[in-house]
Amino acid sequence: MSYGALLQLGFLGLLTASIPLLWVWVKGDADKYRKLVWITTFVTFDLIIFGAFTRLTDSGLGCPDWPGCYGHSNPVTAGEMIRAAEAAMPSGPVTMVKAWIEMLHRYIAMGVGVLILTLMGLAWARRAELKRSPWPATVLFVLVCVQGAFGAWTVTLKLMPVIVTIHLLLGVLLLCMLGALAAQTNPLPIGANAVARLRGPVFFALAVVFGQIALGGWVSTNYAVLACQDFPLCNGALVPAMDFARGFDLTRPLGLNDDGSLLPVQALVAIHWVHRAFALIVVVVLGWLGLVMLAAASDSAYLRNTAWGLFALLGLQVATGVSNVVFAWPLAIAVAHNGGAAAMALLLALLNSRLAARQRDRPVAFAAGARA
């Protein structure tokens, strides 16, 4: 890729970031750090949803090189090569539409990188004024760089399932860390008794949700959503024939065994069935947590609203998960299922951060009159 194309690509990333940055700096709020943290969290959530859309539309190899598209910064100037690839393999992964989807995903990802770089710079420049350590923002910048590397390997290793799944998990981790940072800038009052009752259960629930997201990512990256054709049974059986060893082999390429032979259907069934079975554990854990939160809420509107939000997201996940099977994996429902999982992780990360801050007796725990 030429230096000129790299400069154009960098400019497009800056242009993507300039819209939220302009909004932060033009608004009259004096606490620009707080506003930047929240807008970066929002854009990162959007990036995760668009990443799911990219994966679900089979656009991950719409541009088979990285960081550009056939050595160009955009599909327009790479149009001749894209059309040639499509003509050579009409049912292949390269089309003009898929190339645009993939490159838009990369532009947004670069924009998030610029936002986090700006956030880190602001955290260090105003560390005395903010009275916060700049190291969390620095860790975020390191994480987004690692995430970018996995984004590159996703393409260069031809959608290898373990790489794509780690890429997804790092994205959710980045979102949750941004949420934790955002929670510290938006203090809400939580009683000491509620903290004592909820600190452990919330952290445990967050770990369970991360585990289920990992399993869901493994289903998606292996295209195992329709391996079970019915619900609540799986291909007419409560426990169908499954091949766990091959299904959960982390070293194999997409759709193949290590020896190059096709992955058996039983392996895909195992992947799907484990995700479905673990969903029962998630429902029990989050349902129990929601009830504990309501019992501990007392006069805390935040805890009550969070509990009901958790119930709503849990219902959304169950409904969209079942619908993916019953309605043969419609795109809109599949994207909503991915977005709901990310939203659930973010909700728990926000709550976990506020509970942790209260437990450490930071000012965030005692502040009243939280800002919207």
Question: What does each model-found stretch correspond to?
Answer:
Residues 32, 121-138, 290-310, 370:
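Membrane-interface helix-loop-helix junctions at transmembrane boundaries of multi-pass membrane enzymes
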Residues 1-30:
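Transmembrane alpha-helices
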